[in-house]
Amino acid sequence: MWFKNLTLYRFNKPFAVETEALETALADFTFSPCSSQDVSKFGFSNALGKKGCSLVHSADNRHLICVTKEEKILPGQVIKEALEEKVALIEDEENRKMAKKEKDALKDEIITSLLPRAFSRRSQTHALILPELEMILVDSSSATKAEELLALLRKALGSLPVIPLSFKAPVESNLTEWLKLGSAPLPFEMQDEAELKSEADEGGIVRFKQQDLKEDEVLAHLATGKQVHKLALHFGQSIALLLQSDASVKRLKFSEEFRAGNDEVGTDDPMARLDADFALMGSELVALMHALVAALGGLEDAQV
């Protein structure tokens, strides 16, 4: 359940849907496994996984939701070879060339015949709705997956006025300034990884890892006009992260010491531990968002 990535969105209007109403809305779009002829299925699933019993898990007016996606695996090469074989057979038997429309129809038939025998894979994406911040945090490094989740949530609720998080000043400008100064605003602390890009159309990209970012070798690239587009940071003693210029957060990792804060809860009651971990994570992510917005100079005015 501990989030590993953050794709960030904000509401244009306050989110005022209570837990019970949210649960009811999502219930009409619950996940069901693929049938023999389904290519994929997508829907909401228990927020806390197999041990959970609700689509929404709430604590302190923070709502955790989850979507599950199942996709049939049909290798393109398998379809291509089967199609070529059937096309060759038909063209040989009928002594003619098949039209594109016929080939497309034949391809659909092949896919239909292969679906019942195809393996499938499932993936899950969680999101945390934070009415107090008017934000949604999606645990995904993929903007596409995040948008899929939001699209289904919008369908369930009827409307969802959200936009990607954006700041008054470009994120890369702030990251570049931090690197020049040799430190990030407290409670953030720069680590030993960064990616710098030239703003020129055909400019270069330089990546530093496990290196002191205060060294002249690094700063020399700033002097040539490169800007910082990725920067590894620590948030206090609780979270390690990689902040990117699109305001997304990758490689989010809660420290063992921080997670141990719930050790007194134990593991005898898995649901109690999951609930405690969710409350702990939610509280720290709210603190992280407050600090991030302040460090980056504030959010751009929302467009209603």
UniProtKB/Swiss-Prot annotation:
UniProt-recorded Gene Ontology molecular function terms: double-stranded DNA binding
A UniProt-annotated Pfam family: RdgC
Q: Where in the cell is it found?
A: Cytoplasm, Nucleoid
What cystine pairs are annotated? none
List, alphabetically, the GO terms of the cellular component aspect: bacterial nucleoid; cytoplasm
Which biological processes are named by the entry's GO terms? DNA recombination; regulation of DNA recombination
Q: Write out the entry's keywords from A to Z.
A: Cytoplasm, DNA recombination
Q: Which family is this protein grouped under?
A: Belongs to the RdgC family.
Tell me the function of this protein. Answer: May be involved in recombination.
Q: What is this protein called?
A: Recombination-associated protein RdgC
